[in-house]
């Protein structure tokens, strides 16, 4: 079954929409003729974006299942249903293992993984009833290739990719489309505010503009494409990793050494 979905006229939720990729997605959906409700935890920035784009907004912490249920209920009331759920909210994390706390792990797991699970759990019943629906789950190239130094980010983004795969396998023949967004460096506050070593790493193949990533998302939905890899080199890296895992590990170890030689002040991030 093909789950190609024309975006025009569709009812869309975008989380993490106050800035960056989420805001750019919202703009692209609106330009394509969709109706959008935007969500973010940053109420001030969210209000500004909602006013600029003339859309409804919901302030929420997407790591909360109750909050996701309210987002869906409120959006159903205002839009008359949901066709596309873009689970885009995410948090970074530059620490390694030894300096992270239980609270750190629970926070990043809640936002980067559980928000996707809650969105699917509570959107699927109505999507299955209407025999159509689409999820765009934002992960990262780090979920496919691991990000040096960032234990929590790498682990949770890998889990996000795995959940998106499971969702596509389980519901793809039941009218539900799934795309998993896995960019490298994108010009967002998360990248621009990151330590120098992180910016150097994620920008190794160039920094993309959010609008270009958002355009890739629209194209993926309208062609029922699972993996969205805006940076084409990511696909080459995946092939290299699959062909010789040990060589790939050795290459990543060498890259880590090179980065630490250039940014010795960041050594604690790699423990």
Regions found by a protein language model. Name each.
Residues 140:
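Residue(s) in the substrate-gating loop at a strand-loop-helix junction
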Residues 120, 156:
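Active-site helix of classical SDR
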Residues 96-97, 104-109:
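Substrate-binding pocket helix/loop in short-chain dehydrogenase/reductase
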Residues 11, 18-19:
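Conserved glycine-rich cofactor-binding loop
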Residues 44, 60-70, 102:
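The beta1-alpha1 cofactor-binding region of Rossmann-like NAD(H)/NADP(H)-dependent oxidoreductases
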Residues 199, 204-207, 211-271:
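C-terminal tail/cap regions
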Residues 32, 145, 166-176:
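Active-site-adjacent segment of SDR/Rossmann-fold oxidoreductases
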């Amino acid at each position: 079954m093909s789950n190609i979905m024309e975006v025009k006229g569709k009812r869309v939720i975008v989380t993490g929409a106050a800035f960056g990729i989420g805001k750019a997605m919202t703009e692209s959906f609106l330009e394509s003729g969709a109706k959008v409700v935007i969500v973010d935890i940053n109420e001030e920035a969210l209000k500004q974006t909602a006013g600029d784009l003339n859309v409804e907004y919901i302030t929420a912490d997407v790591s909360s299942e109750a909050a996701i249920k309210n987002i869906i209920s409120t959006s159903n009331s205002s839009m008359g249903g949901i066709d596309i759920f873009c689970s885009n909210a995410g948090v970074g994390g530059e620490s390694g293992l030894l300096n992270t706390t239980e609270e750190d792990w629970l926070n990043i797991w809640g936002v980067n993984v559980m928000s996707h699970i809650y969105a699917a759990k509570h959107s699927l019943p109505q999507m299955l009833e209407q025999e159509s629906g689409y999820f765009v789950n934002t992960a990262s190239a780090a979920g496919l290739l691991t990000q040096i130094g960032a234990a929590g980010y790498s682990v949770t983004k890998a889990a996000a990719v795995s959940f998106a795969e499971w969702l596509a396998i389980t519901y793809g023949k039941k009218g539900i489309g799934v795309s998993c967004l896995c960019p490298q460096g994108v010009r967002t506050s998360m990248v621009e505010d990151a330590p120098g070593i992180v910016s150097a790493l994620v920008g190794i193949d160039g920094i993309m503009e959010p609008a270009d990533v958002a355009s890739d998302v629209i194209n993926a939905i309208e062609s029922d494409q699972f993996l969205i890899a805006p940076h084409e080199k990511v696909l080459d890296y995946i092939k290299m990793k699959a062909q010789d895992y040990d060589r790939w590990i050795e290459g990543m170890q060498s890259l880590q050494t090179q980065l630490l030689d250039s940014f010795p002040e960041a050594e604690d991030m790699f423990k």
